A protein has these predicted regions:
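A cross-family structural signal marking well-folded subdomains
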Residues: 1-120
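Generic hydrophobic alpha-helical scaffold/packing signal
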Residues: 27, 51, 67, 71, ...
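A general structural signal for short secondary-structure junctions and capping/turn motifs
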Residues: 39-41, 154-156, 182-185, 198-200
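Short, well-structured alpha-helical interface segments that form or flank functional binding sites
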Residues: 42-45, 65, 160-163, 185-189
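A broadly conserved detector of short glycine/acidic/proline-rich loop/turn motifs that flank catalytic sites
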Residues: 54, 144-145, 169, 174-175, ...
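Substrate-binding/catalytic groove segments of enzymes
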Residues: 60, 200-201
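Intrinsically disordered, low-complexity N-proximal targeting/linker segments that flank membranes
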Residues: 78-166, 173
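Short beta-strand-alpha-helix junction that forms the catalytic/metal-binding core
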Residues: 163, 175-199
């Protein structure tokens, strides 16, 4: 914060347009990943390095190869839960390493050092978890359909049908079957659904 307050006006004006372009590209990139609302954003802190990287890349971010690597970096940050602490040092490393990776150099540490444990899925129960939000977005990105309408969750359906993450097997049914809340409230028993479909279920 202090660094921003100490920023001279001339330096701000020099990078103002580039910073804005980076943020606009970041929003487009997130929409490609089916992340449409701030409430569904795994890490707000990851937007800063994402915008800086996209500003640095310019229009080259639109190339399939670059986008695939950017998605790999982004999801590793989310599922490695790397932007929850020590954000400044992680951001600085990513802003330096990711553009070099896109130009043929070594993988950034955010990609090369991450290990995701599958048993972690059982402990994701609330929106406070970045990985919980990430699973929801990935389900939509990978082609999840609404059970009632059969529609995929593009941005039109997402907003028009009031899509949110809901239980697959209803809580009451799970209780009747003797299934514990630790299981039925985890991300394993959740999927995106429209408001109406969820009400019918």
């Amino acid at each position: 914060r202090q660094a921003l307050l100490n920023l001279p006006l001339a330096a701000y004006k020099q990078y103002e347009k580039l910073a804005e372009e980076g943020l606009v590209r970041a929003a487009k990139f997130l929409h490609l990943l089916h992340i449409y609302r701030i409430a569904d954003l795994p890490y707000q802190t990851q937007i800063v390095p994402l915008a800086a990287i996209l500003a640095d890349l310019g229009d080259a971010w639109e190339h399939d190869t670059h986008r695939a690597k950017l998605q790999c970096w982004y999801w590793n940050g989310v599922f490695g839960e790397l932007y929850g602490s020590a954000v400044e040092s992680r951001s600085a490393k990513d802003v330096m390493e990711v553009p070099l990776w896109l130009r043929g150099r070594a993988q950034p540490s955010t990609v090369s050092e991450v290990m995701f444990r599958a048993d972690r899925l059982k402990t994701m129960r609330m929106r406070l978890s970045a990985a919980y939000k990430g699973v929801n977005a990935l389900l939509m990105k990978e082609g999840a359909h609404d059970w009632r309408s059969g529609q995929k969750f593009d941005h039109i359906v997402f907003f028009g049908e009031n899509v949110d993450i809901h239980h697959i097997f209803p809580q009451d049914w799970c209780r009747q079957q003797g299934i514990k809340p630790a299981v039925f409230d985890s991300i394993i028993n959740k999927t995106p659904l429209s408001f109406r479909t969820n009400r019918i279920i």
